[in-house]
Structures are given as C-alpha cells and as structure tokens.
Curated annotation (Swiss-Prot):
This is UDP-N-acetylmuramoylalanine--D-glutamate ligase. It is found in: Cytoplasm. GO terms for molecular function: ATP binding; UDP-N-acetylmuramoylalanine-D-glutamate ligase activity. One of its GO terms (cellular component) is cytoplasm. It comes from the Bacteria. GO terms for biological process: cell division; cell wall organization; peptidoglycan biosynthetic process; regulation of cell shape. The lineage of its organism: Bacteria, Pseudomonadati, Spirochaetota, Spirochaetia, Leptospirales. The keyword Coiled coil does not apply. Keywords: ATP-binding, Cell cycle, Cell division, Cell shape, Cell wall biogenesis/degradation, Cytoplasm, Ligase, Nucleotide-binding, Peptidoglycan synthesis. It catalyses: UDP-N-acetyl-alpha-D-muramoyl-L-alanine + D-glutamate + ATP = UDP-N-acetyl-alpha-D-muramoyl-L-alanyl-D-glutamate + ADP + phosphate + H(+). The keyword ATP-binding applies. InterPro entries: Mur-like_cat_sf, Mur_ligase_C_dom_sf, Mur_ligase_cen, MurD.
Length: 462
C-alpha cells in the first residue's frame, strides 16, 4: 500500500484515540486533511467529528484511509469492513515515516526497549545533536516527523510493528524474545513474526542488530538482506560483552563499561546493542565512550526510590512480565535480605521460573493484586511463611510500618520480621501489568514512590 502524496482534503478515519491517535489527529489537521475520530470514549473537547467505535462501519464509505492506533484489535469490525472495501489501513508510525526525511533507528524486543532507545539517543548526543527519540516511549512519531532533524530513535512495540507497513529503517534492533502479549498475538510464532517486521525492506546498506540468543532463529525465519550484527558474550558476536574485564569489544573500539551506572547483565547487553546501533548509524566510538558513564536510566526501571540508614527501596514498576523481573533480579546479590514486592495482573506465563528463583533464598515476598489468585499457592509452597499476601501497595506499607526497625550501628538500620528474617532492601518489581489497579506502570510507580517517601519520613529510626 502506498501512502498518498498529499493528505489535503482527504477524509481519514483515526481509529482509537490515546497518545498516538491524538497525535495523528493533530498531524492530519496540520496537513489540511479532514480527520474523523472513532473511539470508545469521547474526549471532553474535540475539534473534529467523533463517532463511538461501535458505529456501523458502513457509515464510513467515503473514507480514503484509516490510521489505526496500536491498542485496537485487528478483529475490530471497522477493520474487517476496511478489508472488504479495500480501504488502506496504516499505523501512526507509517504516517510519520512517510513524512520524515532523516535516518531512523528502530528498537524492539520483549524487554529493555525503552531503556535501550533512550540509551542510544544518549550515546549519539555528541554526533547527532538534533536527534529525537520517541515511538512507544511515549512521544509519538507524528509529533516531530516534519521537523528538519537528522535522526529519529524509535521504540517500536509488537502492536505498532504488527500494524505497520514495511518501514525501511536504517538500523533495526531486536533485543530479545520471551512470551508476552499472547492475549493479543495468541502464539509465540505470531508474536515473533510481528517483532521481525522491524527488518522489513532493509537493504545491504542497512543493519539489523540482534541478540546472539535469537540470531539463528532469525536466520531460519527470514531472508536477511541487510548487515546482520549480533551482541552477547560469544566471541563470534560483533559486540562482545566481557563482564570479567568490564569491556564491550567491537571491530572499531574497545569500550570501557566499568562506570556504566545500570546494574545487571541484561542492562550491559542493552548497552552492547546500543553501541552497535550507534556505530552502525555513524556515531564515533570516542564520542560513544564519553557518554557511557553519564546515562542514569529511566524512571521506574530499577530506580532508587529512597534510602535511609542502610535501608533501600527500589522502584522497578516497568517490570510487567516475569522475564523482565527475573532479568532485573538475576544479578541481585542480597536475596536473603530482600523483600520482593510482586503482583498486579499476571500475563499468560509459566510461573515455574519464578518459583525456581525464589528457592534461591529470598528474604520474603509481598504479593498484591490479581496475581494472588494465580501465584499465591505456588509461592507459599516454595517459601512458606515468608509470603505476605495483601490487596494492594497501601496494605503492603501498613505491614512494613508494623515491622521492627533495629539498629546495627549508629548509621545502619535493618527491618526485622522475625529472628530468621532481616530486611535491608525492598524491591518493587511486579512482574505483572498494572491494569487491575492503575492506569499504567507510571501511575503505579509514582504511587510506590509516594509510599516510600511517607515511610522513610515517618518510620521510627531510633
């Protein structure tokens, strides 16, 4: 499907509001199109015609094309009608791609997309001072696609890729693959295929950067026409992660990562991918190296939420599946003194890796939300009385306030649950989506931060 050369005067249906849909609306208005919004919720103020999304699709017989928001299911009746009537359907990313004149780095994967997107943008600041980052990160592509900038760094979800036409990206990054969003994609193969669309239309001048763990799967699944570069610990990788010497080696440079701020092997793998992407787009190794120590990460991704006299709280609200939580906790060295706060609405994942992880000697677990009905029995079978099951975060902090703060020294405190359990670290890494109690993971994380602040300001520290 080809995009129209001009949108002026065209009747275009935006199916689904939200961040990307509303940005597409604003862009279409600026291009003098005649957009129509169709959504389940009517905005309080709107300057274009609005229809509820249960309207008879035949009402849209004069529509030239549809811009579909990523949250809309492919089975929506309006999309079925579009297929029947051969009405072109594009994504908001397609719309931005058609009008953008610069280069694009696209980043996908099950976990680490947002961090790696921001990391790439950070590493390239010196060489591409006008670059912008966006996409699924929360800044819609159409909000800046007509600006005269040289580079866009886009986080691309499986929903966005599934909806998009071939994007012809200069550099694509496929970080990792684990079960996720199967309620939408139904099978792992469908999910993988949606992710793999990031490499569509890439030519020999372009680069596809992948984890060594999925390199063979990709080679066996598609005909790769571009340069395929891998990252990992294997000596055959184009970016070799050597954790013993705190180095990442490429054909162009040996990068010192000893001062890289983010903890965990998964974050160093993200850094290796970001370095390869930065080199592939034209970043100078010396400039990339200079930026590495100054990346502080993103909110709600293993963020220090508060510390006081040796007791620390970690906010990892962005952890929305088991794979993400386990990756983040894999390098944690203080399990026996850690209270892990889990829960929310679990995804369709095998919980056995969670139970295996907890058997390594966790201090205790606080389980909240809908996950209690799914995981409580299994967790209790593993850790027994070290599990505390409560409805929500507020109830969790009520429990924390009842536990005894003990003095190890004038400067150091710990929280004692019993003679066997003493806690120094509270890690909120839910491994679940937030929709049972919150609008999104940001709202959930901000609530956790406010509870931590209240706890640290009001707990007895004598």
């Amino acid at each position: 499907m080809k995009f129209p050369e001009s949108l002026k005067g065209l009747k275009i249906l935006v199916l689904g509001g939200g961040i990307s849909g509303n940005s597409a609306l604003d862009f279409l208005i600026s291009e003098e199109a005649q957009p129509i919004l169709c959504d389940r919720n009517q905005p309080e103020t709107i300057s274009v015609p609005f229809f509820h999304d249960n309207i008879d699709p035949r009402s849209f017989f004069e529509i030239s094309l549809i811009i579909k928001s990523p949250g809309i299911l492919p089975t929506h009746p309006i999309l079925s009608y579009a297929v029947e009537k051969k009405i072109p359907v594009f994504s908001e990313i397609d719309l931005g791609r058609f009008f953008f004149k610069g280069k694009i780095i696209g980043i996908t994967g099950t976990d680490g997309k947002s961090t790696t997107t921001s990391l790439v943008a950070h590493l390239l600041k010196k060489d591409f001072s006008d670059l912008k980052e966006g996409g699924n990160l929360g800044i819609p592509f159409t909000s800046f696609c007509k600006e005269p900038i040289s580079l866009a760094v886009l986080e691309l979800s499986s929903y966005q890729l599934e909806d998009s036409s071939p994007l012809d990206l200069n550099v694509s990054v496929f970080l990792n693959l684990a079960p996720d969003h199967l309620e939408r994609h139904e099978t792992m193969e469908n999910y993988f295929r949606a992710k793999l669309k990031i490499a569509d239309l890439q030519n020999p001048n372009h680069s596809l950067i992948v984890s060594e763990k999925i390199r063979e799967k990709i080679l066996n699944s598609t005909s790769v026409q571009c340069k395929l570069l891998s990252f990992g610990r294997a000596t055959t990788s184009e970016a070799i992660l050597d954790e013993s010497s705190s180095e990442i080696r490429t054909s162009k440079f040996i990068y010192d990562i000893s001062r890289f701020y983010l903890p965990g092997t998964h974050n160093r793998e993200n850094l290796a991918a970001a370095i390869l992407a930065s080199e592939a787009i034209g970043g100078k190794p010396e400039s990339i190296q200079a930026q590495i120590p100054f990346f502080m990460g993103l909110p709600h991704r293993f963020q220090i939420a508060g510390e006081k006299r040796g007791i620390s709280f970690i906010n990892d609200s962005k952890s929305t599946n088991l794979h993400s939580m386990l990756a983040g906790m894999s390098a944690w060295k203080n399990l026996d003194r850690t209270c892990l706060i889990l829960g929310g609405r679990p995804k369709q994942e095998d919980p056995k890796p969670l139970y295996d992880f907890l058997m390594r000697g966790i201090g205790c677990v606080v389980l909240i939300g809908e996950a209690r009905s799914v995981w409580e029995k299994g967790i209790r079978n593993v850790i027994g009385e070290k599990l505390f099951s409560v409805e929500n975060l507020d109830e969790a902090f009520k429990i924390f306030k009842k536990w005894n703060v003990i003095s190890e020294s004038p400067e150091i405190r710990k929280i004692r649950l019993s003679s066997e359990i003493t806690i120094s670290y509270f890690v909120f890494s839910p491994a679940c989506v937030s929709f049972d109690q919150y609008k999104n993971f940001e709202e959930r994380g901000n609530h956790f931060l406010s509870l931590v602040e209240d706890f640290l300001n009001n707990a007895s520290w004598t």
